[in-house]
Design a protein with these regions (language model features):
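Short, charged interaction patches at domain edges and termini
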Residues: 1-3, 45-49, 54, 95-131
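Hydrophobic beta-strand residues in large extracellular and virion-surface proteins
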Residues: 9, 13, 82, 106-110
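Short beta-strand elements
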Residues: 21-22, 92-97
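Residues in well-ordered beta-strands of folded domains
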Residues: 23, 39, 62, 111-113
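A contiguous binding-surface segment within folded domains or other stable secondary-structure elements
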Residues: 32, 37-76
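Short, hydrophobic/π-rich interface segment
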Residues: 69-89
């Protein structure tokens, strides 16, 4: 499920910022800018009723701006676009959206909540022969 959500994040980022590189969990040496780094910060998975589960995954999107000398203005603009676009990811609700700039890197943090229903695997009935 987490990989599905990460892919949805990457798809939206690619639509909003087609020229930006998108990295997953790790930035390679000599990475290109502008770029995004998608990081899973925390996840929880709690049993609700019967076979139902409530889950949440918290993300940190780090944005490395292209222009070093105007990085804060670029970060403000990118932050605004992301916060507006990230309300729902593939029908998953996005909550707790915040953004901050640290050392000229934008961090947009949010949580994705979803529910799962586990289905039990039973052996199928065989044919019944009546006489």
């Amino acid at each position: 499920m987490v990989n599905e959500i990460k892919q949805a994040i990457a798809n939206i980022l690619h639509e909003l910022f087609p020229n930006a590189e998108i990295y997953d969990e790790d930035v390679p040496q000599g990475f290109k800018t502008p770029s995004f780094l998608i990081i899973v910060v925390e996840s929880s998975y709690k049993k609700a009723i019967d076979e139902k589960y409530n889950a949440s995954v918290s993300f940190d999107l780090a944005y490395f701006p292209e222009r070093e000398y105007e990085s804060k203005n670029e970060c403000y603009e990118v932050s605004q676009n992301i916060l507006r676009a990230f309300d729902v990811l593939n029908s998953y609700k996005v909550t707790n959206k915040t953004s901050s700039i640290t050392d000229n890197v934008l961090h947009v943090k949010f949580t994705v909540k979803y529910r799962e229903i586990k289905t039990s695997q039973f052996e199928k009935m065989r044919d019944i022969i009546f006489n």
